[in-house]
């Protein structure tokens, strides 16, 4: 069932296709769109089904050609009545609308003949009148003496300039319709009908030749006295019609409903009164000129502009003018992007609204190779886009050369500067308000931004905040209107990396804003000022700043401001730290207005910021400036502490072995009780190592100042006791080796005088602590060699795991090779040393024991120890740490470094630590190497060392191996990044 909907608000430029496009997707049968027009812009649409009508009603409030439309339910009866009413109005308009010469003196309308009606009947035959027409005219003249001006006026309204246009055959249809009323006019002479009996003499009528009336035509020439016709200009009802565009009836207010352009196009066969066709004739120019003296219909300046979208980027002004060929184009402005290239859009200014209306009809027509869209524009858009190029001409004296419709609204009063657009000046001052200036912007940057424009001297004002930094606001005053409009066209153009907003502002408004800014600075409270500076000018110790760390490296100011939402912070008070290359450091500094605000930010500690936990620390302004100058390395927990002998060695705080600084709990080890060395003063702790069955093996304590004296046994490290007496031997200096401790009774060893070994040590009985990581390999080699047995043979031999395959020579077996102990002749247990066979009941000792008793009795035939005892784990580097023994502790005077291995997984050696591997677990299966490198950003990861692990099917397991350049780097990474998320999973880091 067909349903009718009534549409109101249809613009005059819309047609049936626009309505169908508005209801696209709905079924409208052919002939289902009826445009009625009228003051409400009405149309009726017939839908095929109820569902289509229901969906169509839901589109009420939409826009057609930029005009909002309203939809109402209707019926076929209402539609037919409205169409019929519109048709009647249109037909009666031909008879009822006052004619162009109605204002002149003449007979009243009740005379039975309208001059408008007879105009077509007389004008078309004026150039070549027929005898019948002449007789009709003369008869009318004779029978109606009181209509003296009819024939003359009607003839006078058709000047010769009309040519044959009025005599075209198309008017033949109107001649009969107008001739019939002419036949009804002669009734006045009918009264003589009673004399009809005299008809017999009618035969004499034939002798009356029709030509004789032709001679009577000469009297017609008296028409020239029609000079009174020039009184036509005063007609007041015609201006709307004469101002009507050639095919643009809408602007004419008096037009009847149905003639507003939304109906059928104007034609010569649609019973339209020929008076409306005046604009199509040369007479139109006369009428338009005559309108110049009539100011009853001012033209809206916005009716002169159109916007063109989708033009080819190569289009030039000539291409646009060619596209609007036949129309009077005043100016063309092609819009450009910030680089200066055409962006495919433009604005066109025409000389009259008629041209604008015709230009809108060229919407979606082809320009070069692209279909462009033409839509209405406003004067404000023209000026904002750079219309100043021609705008000044149209306002100046040259504007008088343009048709009066263009200059009327601008010359109506001296205050022509006060126009409806908001981007124009409202008084003599040509001032602009700038927003978004870079904080480091100066006057020279503003001058360069407005280069080639005349700026009033000393008129540039850049606003600064209480902290002395620019707020991004500024003001500039120009000398003339043209430069002012050109400055407005710089809106959203770039100054450096920021685009600047240029807004118009009156001079009064500018001065008020500047005054407000100055008052704000003056009213800045002393308390707040004290937060920044104390009376002496020194930096205050109030903690009004925050140092945010462990944030993504791509963080921006806006991200930080969102993170601090709820705490008043200025954008200028946020500073994201970057390195020399402009890369983010994952840190930010924020300066708050009050100390309370700073303390509020502490509640955000460990809150998520773009997926990472942000660490918020409150600092003073002085600290903030120091951090800003020297940003700390991200993720380094250790502090640089000055240590004697090596002041630049980082000390890693931890709860591990005393002074060792290794972040772990106490590491078990096999205690090797140390025999105190003479002169040591305080015996050192025994060397822990893996558990070994049998008696404890004493180690050599690290001596203090060389002072001869009796040996003092050192305390044994805790551990499961092993039966058997402790064997004598030199104490082993250095850090404790991991493994369960096995104490045995310490057997005093010979007093060996010698200088103290400089460098690292372990806690002595006196309580002193020395950082054992501070001794370099160079320092360790300064003393004579200390030979210590290294390879204990036995069935329970073990060794550190081999390095992962495929990691190259840098991760080779770095087990230290123990130097030969030589043949000292000391009786004791047989110990195997690398490359030497150890005889039972014999222990090799230093050759310096020559004058000292060497036989300490018989011990067990052998003591099994794990091979490679003292060797370090893989990953300690190709150069293990060295510790020097006391002098004369070797077979010769030359240096003999001792290679001490640390506990598995930790670098206990000093000097140059080698590469270290970290095992990353519980990663997302889709993780990439780049994501892993980004996760460890800031740490010294060896390039190309990231190795993802796959199962036998080639599927990722979520694990990877990452190599770091040093042990410290790997340790710091484990401490800082363990349990941190990669994606949605928290990864586990295991030191390899």
Swiss-Prot record:
Q: Which SUPFAM superfamilies does UniProt cross-reference here?
A: RNA-binding domain, RBD (SSF54928)
Supply the PROSITE patterns for this chain: RRM (PS50102)
Tell me where in this chain the RRM domain is found: 304-379, 430-507, 916-992
Q: Where are stretches of biased composition, namely Polar residues?
A: 408-417
Q: Name one Pfam family in it.
A: RRM_1
Q: Where in the cell is it found?
A: Nucleus
Q: Which residues form the signal peptide?
A: none
One cellular component (GO) term of this entry: nucleus
Phosphoserine-modified residues are 352, 375, 420, 422, 424, 525
GO terms for MF: RNA binding
Arranged from A to Z, the UniProt key words for this protein are:
Nucleus, Phosphoprotein, Repeat, RNA-binding
The superkingdom of the source organism is Eukaryota
User: According to the UniProt entry, which residue ranges have a biased composition of type Low complexity?
Assistant: 876-887
Region (Disordered) spans which residues?
393-424, 849-913
Listed InterPro entries: ESRP (IPR050666), Nucleotide-bd_a/b_plait_sf (IPR012677), RBD_domain_sf (IPR035979), RBM12_RRM1 (IPR034591), RBM12_RRM2 (IPR034594), RBM12_RRM3 (IPR034855), RBM12_RRM4 (IPR034856), RBM12_RRM5 (IPR034854)
**Could you tell me what this protein is called?**
RNA-binding protein 12
User: What organism is listed for this UniProt entry?
Assistant: Mus musculus
Upper lineage is: Eukaryota, Metazoa, Chordata, Craniata, Vertebrata
